[in-house]
C-alpha cells in the first residue's frame, strides 16, 4: 500500500543519493527530466526560499512510500486555472526512485491520484495536470496509459502539457 507524506529535510536527506551517479544507471534521466542538476534537498529548499514563485495556492514536496521503501518524490503545485477558475493539481515532476524505474510504481502512484480524485492533504482539485519534457518517452507513455490527454505544448516545443478531468 502506498502512502503520501510531506518531505522532511532531516528525515529524507538520504533521498539526495538518488541524484548521484553511483546510485543508479538512470543518473542522466534523473537530471534531465526531474532534478535539473540539483539534489532533492536543494529543490525542496528552493520552494521554502521562494514560496510565491509558482503563483500557486500551495506547493508541496511529497515523498511516496511503499511500506518503509521510499519509492518516489512528487512536486505538487495546487493552483486555480486562469482559463476556467478550476482547481488544478499539477504534478511537476514525479521522480521514481531510480533503482525502481520500470517496476510499475509510477503508474500505481498516478492511478492512486486519479482514484482519490487528487484529494491528498488539503487539496480538492477539478483536474490533474502534468508538464512533460518532449523527449521523456517513459513519462509520456505513463500519463497517456492512465487517461491523460495532450492539451498543449510550450512555444519552443520542449514541454508537453497533459490534463485529466476528475
Question: For each of these PLM feature ranges, what is it?
Answer:
Residues 97-99, 103, 134-135:
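Active-site acidic-Proline motif in GNAT/NAT acetyltransferases
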Residues 5-99, 116:
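Acetyl-CoA-dependent GNAT
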Residues 119-132:
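Conserved GNAT acetyl-CoA-binding A-motif
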Amino acid at each position: 500500500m502506498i502512502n503520501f507524506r510531506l518531505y522532511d529535510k532531516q528525515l529524507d536527506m538520504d533521498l539526495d543519493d538518488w541524484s548521484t551517479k553511483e546510485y543508479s544507471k538512470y543518473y542522466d534521466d534523473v537530471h534531465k527530466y526531474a532534478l535539473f542538476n540539483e539534489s532533492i534537498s536543494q529543490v525542496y529548499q528552493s520552494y521554502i526560499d521562494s514560496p510565491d514563485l509558482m503563483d500557486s495556492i500551495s506547493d508541496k514536496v511529497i515523498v511516496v512510500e511503499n511500506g518503509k521503501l521510499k519509492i518516489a518524490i512528487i512536486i505538487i503545485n495546487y493552483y486555480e486555472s486562469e482559463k476556467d477558475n478550476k482547481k488544478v493539481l499539477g504534478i511537476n515532476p514525479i521522480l521514481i526512485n531510480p533503482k525502481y524505474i520500470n517496476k510499475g510504481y509510477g503508474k500505481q502512484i498516478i492511478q492512486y491520484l486519479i482514484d482519490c480524485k487528487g484529494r491528498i492533504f488539503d487539496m480538492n482539485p477539478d483536474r490533474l495536470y502534468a508538464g512533460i519534457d518532449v523527449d521523456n518517452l517513459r513519462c509520456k507513455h505513463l500519463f497517456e496509459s492512465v487517461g491523460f490527454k495532450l492539451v498543449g505544448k510550450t512555444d519552443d516545443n520542449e514541454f508537453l502539457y497533459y490534463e485529466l478531468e476528475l
